[in-house]
Each structure stands twice: as structure tokens, then as C-alpha cells.
Amino acid sequence: MKKVLLVNGPNLNRLGVREVNVYGKGTLATLEADMKQEAETMGVELECFQSNHEGAIIDRIHEAEDIYEGIILNPGAFTHYSYAIRDAIASISIPVIEVHISNIHQRESFRHESVTAAVCAGQIVGFGFYGYKLALFALMEKLREA
């Protein structure tokens, strides 16, 4: 059974409360439960992790290489400025799919650039929680191609 790590960054623990007009009413717990169920139907074991701390996310990315076949990552606001997370992704050999609930390219100009996307296998934005499922499908396809 393939193992995948789902990492959600800062403020995503506030889903369902924070800016529901942008992120929707669903909670992180709902998202994680739905993703685990979807992964199970695909024969994938999914572990979920959320942190508001850059170092904790970096540590988890480093550890993932020896445990998981791939990572689905929503770096939150770190997307736009964390060269440390970018370098952590670049330092591992497993594929990472970047996902965002909202379309970062339609929002404030400071959100348009992702410093992490260039070292990811791909980026999925703007499809709400469904984007996470798309990321899982894409990751599984990437692993089949390898």
C-alpha cells in the first residue's frame, strides 16, 4: 500500500471559520476525513499533518522521504515567501504536489507568486477542497509513471 503525507500550513486549522467567502465552510477535520476516505478507495494510506510553524513543516518534509511515496502540500502563506520550505522540497527525492483551495492568481497581487511551485511536481489551485483530491489523483499518476 502506498503511503502519502498531506501537509497543511499556517491558518488552515481555521478552515470553516476564517474567510469562508474564500475558503468555504468546510473544516480541516472534514477535509482530512474526506481525503483519508478517498485515499482508502485508491489503496493509499494517507497521513495528515498541519502546522502554523515553518520549521515543523520543514522537519516533516525532510522526514517524509524515508516514509512516504509522495506529499500533497498546501503551504498556506508560506507559498509566497518561504525559501526554506522551497529548499526542503528541493532536497527530497519524492514528488510533491502543491495545492491551494482558492485561486491564488485571482487574489491579491502578493499571492500571485509561489516560490515553492518551481520545485514541486505540479500545482493545483482554485478548486476548493476538491483540489486536494485532484492532487491525490495527480500524485498517484506521477508515481505510476516513475
Swiss-Prot record:
GO biological process: amino acid biosynthetic process; aromatic amino acid family biosynthetic process; chorismate biosynthetic process; quinate catabolic process
A GO term, aspect molecular function: 3-dehydroquinate dehydratase activity
UniProt key word Hydrolase: no
Active site: residue positions: Y23, H100
Keyword Hydrolase tagged: no
EC number: 4.2.1.10
Keyword tags: Amino-acid biosynthesis, Aromatic amino acid biosynthesis, Lyase
Enzyme class: lyase
InterPro entries hit by this protein: DHquinase_II, DHquinase_II_CS, DHquinase_II_sf
Residues the record marks as site: Transition state stabilizer: R18
Catalysed reaction, written as an equation: 3-dehydroquinate = 3-dehydroshikimate + H2O
One Pfam entry name: DHquinase_II
Binding site for substrate: N74, H80, D87, I101, S102, R111
PROSITE patterns: DEHYDROQUINASE_II
Pathway this chain belongs to: Metabolic intermediate biosynthesis; chorismate biosynthesis; chorismate from D-erythrose 4-phosphate and phosphoenolpyruvate: step 3/7
Assembly and interaction partners: Homododecamer.
Function: Catalyzes a trans-dehydration via an enolate intermediate.
Family label: Belongs to the type-II 3-dehydroquinase family.
Protein name, per record: 3-dehydroquinate dehydratase
Source organism per UniProt: Bacillus cereus (strain AH187)
Gene this chain is encoded by: aroQ
